[in-house]
UniProtKB/Swiss-Prot annotation:
Organism in which the protein naturally occurs: Halalkalibacterium halodurans (strain ATCC BAA-125 / DSM 18197 / FERM 7344 / JCM 9153 / C-125) (Bacillus halodurans)
Compartments in which it is found: Cell membrane
Signal peptide: none
Gene3D superfamilies, alphabetized: F1F0 ATP synthase subunit B, membrane domain (1.20.5.620)
Gene Ontology molecular functions: proton-transporting ATP synthase activity, rotational mechanism; proton-transporting ATPase activity, rotational mechanism
Protein name: ATP synthase subunit b
Length: 162
């Protein structure tokens, strides 16, 4: 039946082993090196992506905190501005009140001065008229001393009436 050729089988087996050894020496090792480099590169990229993701999360958290802090600072600035505006409003009202009081006092002082001037002017006119009337009534010349006495009495009477 079948006759097995052992020499051919051994030759093919040796040739296969030599081919396997050559492939492993020159093809498989460089191919495995490329595969290992590729695997390492993929692992490095995954690690870098994880680092980048963590860094992005940290940056996002920092930005969130910065926005929150800025919001708080803005709220604080608004509160300070409101407080300052209320304080300035009160100061303006107080200044206006004080100015009004000062103007009132000045007006009262001016009225008092004008009243005193009017009274003095009236006294002078009354004194002049009194002298004229007294001169005509008495029909005599008064000396200066008597005239002053008469004026003082008349002014005293006029002052009491005022």
């Amino acid at each position: 039946m079948f006759d097995i050729n052992w020499g051919s089988i051994i030759y093919q087996l040796i040739a296969f082993c030599v081919l396997l050894w050559l492939l492993s020496k020159f093809a498989l090792k460089p191919l495995m090196g490329v595969m290992e480099k590729r695997e390492q590169m993929i692992n490095d990229q995954i690690d870098q992506a994880d680092k980048d993701r963590k860094a992005a999360q940290e940056y996002l958290e920092q930005q969130r905190l910065a926005v929150e802090k800025a919001r708080e600072e803005a709220q604080e600035i608004v509160q300070k501005a409101k407080k300052l505006s209320e304080q300035q409003g009160q100061e303006i009202v107080e200044a206006a009140r004080a100015e009004g009081e000062r103007l009132k006092e000045a007006a009262l002082a001016e009225i008092q001065r004008e009243k005193e001037q009017a009274v003095a002017s009236l006294r002078e006119q009354v004194a002049s008229l009194s002298v004229l009337i007294a001169t005509k009534v008495i029909e005599k010349e008064l000396d200066e001393k008597e005239q002053e006495k008469l004026i003082a009495e008349y002014l005293k009477e006029v002052g009491e009436e005022l």
